[in-house]
Amino acid sequence: MDYGRDPIFPEGFLWGASSAAWQVEGGVAEGGRTPAIIDLNSKTKKPYADNSIAADHYHHWKEDVQLMAECGFTSYRFSLAWPRIIPASDGKVNPEGIQFYNDLIDELLAHNITPIVTLYHYDMPVWVDELGGWRDRRVIELFDHYVRVCFEAFGDRVKYWLSINEQNMQIVYGKWLGLDKGCANWEKDKW
């Protein structure tokens, strides 16, 4: 299954897969992580399933990376869980969250898998949402702080960064994602 040497694809082509922290990690109440808006919605809104365990990547990341290597992956695009890194409004960094992602990144690199990191994939911390979330200008400074922490912690090994996954979904499926507060006519207003 190793397509890395297929002559049809150019040298350096990145073979791999992608995931989102909320879809694969699980461990939503472990390692200092606090709730994200998607955690609350995954328990109550269709089509989401409860993400408390998900694929349990939080506990099986090393095995998961081994499987990626066996499949011939040369890249893995994953997201960081903002509430695992900055769990509270005091802005303090969670060392357990940083260590989890450091270990994952190091393991990927040990298997010659390029980490591609998405900074936000629907998992705004509940504490940010309680301040108004994307509708409040304070989110600019909060997101900036989070991003700078990530660059400082992982930037020596991560070359490829994505800021926000599927920005359009914030509008199109805002209600499902927990972003409909203060927007009674979200269905009409999204267009």
Predicted regions and their residues:
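Short, conserved clusters of charged catalytic residues that mark active-site
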Residues: 1, 53, 60-63, 145-146
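Glycine-rich, proline-tolerant flexible connector loops at the mouths of alpha/beta enzymes
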Residues: 80-93
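Active-site mouth loops of central-metabolism enzymes
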Residues: 46-60, 134-138
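Active-site region of glycoside hydrolase catalytic domains
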Residues: 2-45, 88-89, 98-191
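A common structural microfeature
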Residues: 12-14, 58, 75
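Catalytic domains of carbohydrate-active enzymes, especially glycoside hydrolases
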Residues: 60-81
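Residue-level marker of alpha-helix boundaries and capping positions
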Residues: 55, 92-95
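Internal amphipathic alpha-helical repeat/solenoid segments
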Residues: 57-66, 87, 97
